[in-house]
Amino acid sequence: MKDPTGRDADNIAFGSTLSNDRHADKSFDYLIANPPYGKDWKRDEAAVRAEHERGAAGRFGPGLPRISDGQLLFLLHMLAHAKEAKDGGSRVAIIMNGSPLFTGDAGSGESELRRYILENDLLEALIALPEQLFYNTGIATYVWVVSNRKTPARKGKVQLIDATSFWVQMRRSLGDKRREIPVERARDILKILRDFKDGDTRLVKKDGAGEETVVSRIYPTTQFGFRKITVERPLRLNFQASPERVARLEDEKGFQALAQSKKKGPAAEKELAEGWAAQKAVRQLVRSLTSTLFKDREAFEGVLDNSAKSTGLKLSAPVRKAILTALCERDETGAICRDKDGYPEPDPELRDTESVALAETVEAFFNREVRPHVPDAWIDTSRRDPKDGEVGVVGYEINFNRYFYRYKPPRPLEEIEADIRSIEIDIVRLLGEITGSLAG
């Protein structure tokens, strides 16, 4: 293969970029790519995971995205071929769809890769391109400008550029490609990037009219980070040995296990007979309990244990748990259930998560947003970020459209009512014409 000047294109290598790096010993000043959108990397999985295990010695040490989308792997590949900052550094431009911006919860592969890029201050800018630019897809796409040689003014910051309106209609469509970016608009995008102004505006056509619109926003890298905390609420139950609840004991695994055996022959028959007898004794115990409604688990446990003791029945932990589970129901007016150390037990059904901006402390957020509404809630401090050890798992996402959202108030009610009346008049007129023609 030759380039337009007739020179051999020696740097074009055959094979998969992800599993067979044909430029492993090279670094470059500039790197550009347009990888497949949403393409899985199953065919390269073994090689990619092996290289990931090498850590910093491989291209994929920072992390791996989900198997269904390999776009971020191409970005890691390019970063691995960047020159070190002390040698002048490099700049990378890669076009990807919206998935790498926000797919994946805190702690996921995608989030950890965004974290790596932002916490190492590598993301210089994100440029949202117009839709319908590509032959095979009309989806939204974004240019990631990544660099390890940021200017002093850009350090610790990310520029978002909304270039979604910088397009003209093509005279003839090519598949899904119906738009293109003219040269003058491309130059303007570069000017916005170079000028690096927060709140920079351009005249944009909207609904047939020109409107001065913000096309550039600048934020600190921490703007896109958050901590996902787990909020717990106490378990509250009531207990009653009513006929309906007693019947539920038959469905509890701990109770059913009494009459099950893994043995064979006479030994199995003996074990089953003993199990059936144990089940009968447990049924009699439960049916003998008072039908009084208890709103305190500890009080009910005392009644249960005393009854078992008086009959000489020894309850194993699984059977005791089965009885308590069968006879309980959630009750927001019940007393808080506590563990052996006196701490409130969490209710899994009331468990919730909250995302706290990195710029705010977890405690301040909790006291402002959670405690006023659920005073008995608490933060599960055992769920911590594996990297910094702080409460809450760190995540990063870039919801691009949120930063350029402009509230558009609804039309005045009078205008809407006038439109409805006009439509009603038209309907009555049309019905009159139809019925008149039928009568004729």
Can you say where each PLM-predicted feature lies in the sequence?
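S-adenosyl-L-methionine
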Residues: 1-26
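Conserved helix-loop functional segments at active or binding sites
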Residues: 1-4, 80, 84, 436
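A conserved structural/catalytic subdomain of Rossmann-like adenosyl-cofactor enzymes
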Residues: 19-21, 25-432
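Charged, surface-exposed alpha-helical interface/stalk elements
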Residues: 422, 439-440
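Residue-level recognition of alpha-helical coiled-coils
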Residues: 432, 436-439
